[in-house]
């Protein structure tokens, strides 16, 4: 058993899904050409005056409510002063003294079935910096499209004790934020980023160990790997009698290790002071009530609804609510008249397998709720079998309409007794031994005869109808 304990705190930056930036009217569009979505406020021109984005502040309030945090009633803005090429103003507008939310928590479910409450110290609404790109040819380029994009920074309490707990916390945090609708939390697009603080100390020590930072981790798995490596590195250093330095490190994915960026000799001095160009904002009870009433259904609420209304298992409901787009897709398919249980089975099984194989998000595929619903209804009304549905599923992932595909490819299941009975009688005429076996109590014979009918009809016969007709005809003989 280890003689050390680990302390982890996470700072998560979530890009808010607003139409314009935090303090200017520049649009927010991911993927646009460099420096297209900027103006003089983003550039920090002298004499220009910012204006706070009400939608960004309300998004921060929604995040605070989703994370069970208290909302600050009088919010003022602060300048965080630092120089870096992607920050032409040489300061960032943030909420150092009066964060929009404080003293919240997130409940995580551990693999052993127990729960743990991870504290939320505070949530800040602030603006993002631009983006540097280094060509390696002796110069760097700066794209200010991201400059001024509104963020909410979520700072956890340092009561995360392991890389596994950190991973569970990040997954739950992403789910909670995504279901509010304030962010798409796509890490691959930079709309969710993680800064890690980790220290290790001997069990029973009164003081925390020396904190090491790992900056700008853009994957939950990377965060888990970085923490696992850094936890072991610090333990090894302490076991060897070395002192842990106060450092900033980065995660190197190919080696799954952390690499030193710089040594910190003291705390950063950002010379915070109140932003003189933005007024204090009073958050009233009525405003909080209005924002709270606008919060959509949470993931936990959906899980309860899926269990109570559609008789899904807790595990099925949990898988369907891992992402907002999957939950919304499920609701749309069921609202279109598809069987809730069969819909859940297809989304959890075939659809998830397809997404894993193609490495696509559901919204980026050609699959639509209407097409999946149409296929499921064709199964339930007996038009196609579950075996034929495999071909139809492949077609609808390519954007084809299920009913048209079935008709075009002759996949309509043969269910008409008037057409099936002559075929079945011909099979029976050719298999007298099977008839004798059945009458002798060998019930398995029915499976063989059903197989012969399916072979004769090229797999298009309805197995249920075939079974019923076979029993009826066998009794006549």
UniProtKB/Swiss-Prot annotation:
SUPFAM superfamilies reported in the protein's UniProt record: GatB/YqeY motif, Glutamine synthetase/guanido kinase
Function noted in UniProt: Allows the formation of correctly charged Asn-tRNA(Asn) or Gln-tRNA(Gln) through the transamidation of misacylated Asp-tRNA(Asn) or Glu-tRNA(Gln) in organisms which lack either or both of asparaginyl-tRNA or glutaminyl-tRNA synthetases. The reaction takes place in the presence of glutamine and ATP through an activated phospho-Asp-tRNA(Asn) or phospho-Glu-tRNA(Gln).
Keywords attached to this entry: ATP-binding, Ligase, Nucleotide-binding, Protein biosynthesis
Family: Belongs to the GatB/GatE family. GatB subfamily.
Subunit structure: Heterotrimer of A, B and C subunits.
Any one GO molecular function term: glutaminyl-tRNA synthase (glutamine-hydrolyzing) activity
GO biological process, one term: glutaminyl-tRNAGln biosynthesis via transamidation
Enzyme class: ligase
Entry EC no(s): 6.3.5.-
Database matches in InterPro entries: Asn/Gln-tRNA_amidoTrfase_suB/E, Asn/Gln-tRNA_Trfase_suB/E_cat, Asn/Gln_amidotransferase, Asn/Gln_tRNA_amidoTrase-B-like, GatB, GatB_C_1, GatB_Yqey_C_2, Gln-tRNA_amidoTrfase_suB_CS
Protein name: Aspartyl/glutamyl-tRNA(Asn/Gln) amidotransferase subunit B
Catalytic activity: L-glutamyl-tRNA(Gln) + L-glutamine + ATP + H2O = L-glutaminyl-tRNA(Gln) + L-glutamate + ADP + phosphate + H(+); L-aspartyl-tRNA(Asn) + L-glutamine + ATP + H2O = L-asparaginyl-tRNA(Asn) + L-glutamate + ADP + phosphate + 2 H(+)
Stretch forming the signal peptide: none
Keyword ATP-binding: yes
Organism annotation: Oenococcus oeni (strain ATCC BAA-331 / PSU-1)
Keyword Ligase: yes
């Amino acid at each position: 058993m280890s003689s050390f304990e680990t302390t982890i705190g996470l700072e998560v930056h979530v890009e808010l899904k607003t139409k314009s930036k935090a303090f200017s009217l520049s649009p927010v569009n991911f993927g646009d050409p460099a420096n297209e979505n900027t103006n003089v406020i983003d550039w920090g021109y002298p004499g220009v005056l910012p204006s706070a984005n009400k939608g960004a502040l309300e998004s921060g309030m929604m995040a605070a409510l989703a994370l069970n945090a208290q909302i600050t009633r009088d919010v003022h803005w602060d300048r965080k002063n630092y120089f870096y090429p992607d920050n032409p103003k040489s300061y960032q507008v943030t909420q150092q003294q009066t964060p929009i939310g404080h003293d919240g928590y997130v409940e995580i479910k551990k693999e052993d079935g127990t729960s743990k409450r991870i504290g939320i110290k505070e949530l800040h609404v602030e603006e993002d910096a631009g983006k540097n790109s280094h060509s390696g040819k002796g110069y760097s380029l700066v794209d200010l499209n991201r400059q001024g994009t509104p963020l909410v920074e979520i700072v956890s309490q340092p009561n995360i004790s392991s890389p596994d707990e950190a991973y569970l916390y990040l997954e739950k945090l992403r789910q909670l934020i995504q279901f509010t609708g304030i962010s798409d939390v796509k890490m691959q697009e930079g709309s969710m980023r993680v800064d890690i603080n980790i220290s290790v100390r001997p069990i029973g020590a009164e003081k925390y160990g020396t904190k090491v930072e790992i900056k700008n981790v853009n994957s939950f798995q990377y965060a888990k790997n970085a923490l696992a490596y850094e936890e072991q590195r610090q333990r090894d250093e302490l076991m060897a009698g070395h002192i842990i330095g106060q450092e900033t490190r980065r995660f190197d994915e190919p080696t799954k290790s952390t690499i030193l960026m710089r040594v910190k000799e003291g705390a950063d001095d950002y010379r915070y002071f109140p932003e003189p160009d933005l007024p204090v904002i009073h958050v009233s009870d009525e405003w909080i009530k209005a924002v709270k009433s606008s919060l959509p259904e949470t993931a936990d609420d959906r899980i309860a609804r899926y269990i109570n209304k559609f008789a899904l298992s807790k595990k099925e409901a949990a898988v369907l609510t891992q992402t907002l787009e999957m939950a919304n897709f499920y609701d749309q398919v069921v609202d279109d008249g598809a069987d809730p249980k069969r819909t859940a089975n297809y989304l959890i099984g075939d659809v998830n397998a397809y997404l894993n194989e193609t490495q696509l998000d559901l919204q980026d595929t050609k699959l639509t709720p209407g097409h999946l619903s149409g296929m499921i209804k064709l199964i339930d009304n007996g038009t196609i079998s579950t075996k034929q549905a495999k071909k139809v599923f492949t077609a609808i992932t390519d954007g084809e309409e299920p009913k048209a595909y079935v008709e075009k490819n002759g996949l309509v299941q043969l269910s008409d007794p008037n057409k099936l009975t002559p075929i079945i009688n011909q099979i029976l005429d050719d298999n007298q031994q099977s008839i004798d076996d059945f009458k002798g109590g060998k019930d398995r014979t029915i499976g063989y005869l059903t197989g012969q009918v399916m072979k004769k009809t090229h797999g298009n016969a309805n197995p249920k109808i075939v079974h019923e007709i076979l029993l009826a005809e066998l009794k006549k003989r």
